[in-house]
Amino acid sequence: LHLSLRRQRQMCIRDRLEVDLIPQGTLAERCRAGGAGIPAFYTPAGYGTEISEGKEVRIYKGKPHILETALTADFSFVKAWKGDTAGNLIYKGTARNFNPLMAMAGKITVAEVEELVEAGKLDPNQIHTPGIFVQRIVQGVNYEKRIEQLTVRKKTHDVK
C-alpha cells in the first residue's frame, strides 16, 4: 500500500483502513517464517520507532530486538513467468523477491503463468517455487509490456 495515494489516505483518516508499517525485509521474513512454520522471530529492524510500539523487546549481544510474528494466508496469488502442470514455477526479475515466499505462506496458492509446459519440461535448477506449494495453476493471456517513456521536455519539432 502506498500511502501517498489520495483514496488510501482518506480511508486511513476515516478509520476505514488499518495500516501496519513494516520494513520490507521484515515483511519478507514474516512471510518466509509463515511458510516454514516458524511462529515468530526477533529482529532489530524498527526498534525505537512506532513499529516497535507494544511489541516484546529482548536484548541480544547488547542490541535490542523486537518480536515479529509470522504471516500466513488462506490464499496466495502469485504471478510467474513459466510453470509446469505440476505447479513448479520460474519467476523473472523482481518477481523472485516475494512470490516464492508468498507461495509458501499460503494454505492455497494460485499461480498465474505466462507460459505453461508439461511436467518435467523445466530445468530443475531453474525452479524457484516447487510444485508442492502450488495448488492451482492457470495460464494467463494478453500480456502487455508496460514501459514508461521518459519525457524531459515537450517535443517541439522532429529531429532528423
Q: What are the residue ranges of the model-derived segments?
A:
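Single conserved hydrophobic/aromatic residue that forms the stacking wall/gate
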Residues: 1-13
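ATP/pyrophosphate-binding catalytic subdomain of soluble kinases
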Residues: 15-93
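Short gly/pro/ser/thr-enriched loop/turn and capping motifs at secondary-structure boundaries
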Residues: 7, 26-29, 117-119
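Conserved catalytic block of serine-dependent lipid acyl chemistry
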Residues: 71, 89-91, 96, 104-107, ...
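ATP/nucleoside-binding phosphotransfer catalytic cores, i.e., glycine-rich phosphate-binding loops
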Residues: 83, 101-160
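Alpha-helical scaffold segments in soluble metabolic enzymes
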Residues: 8, 30-33, 75, 79, ...
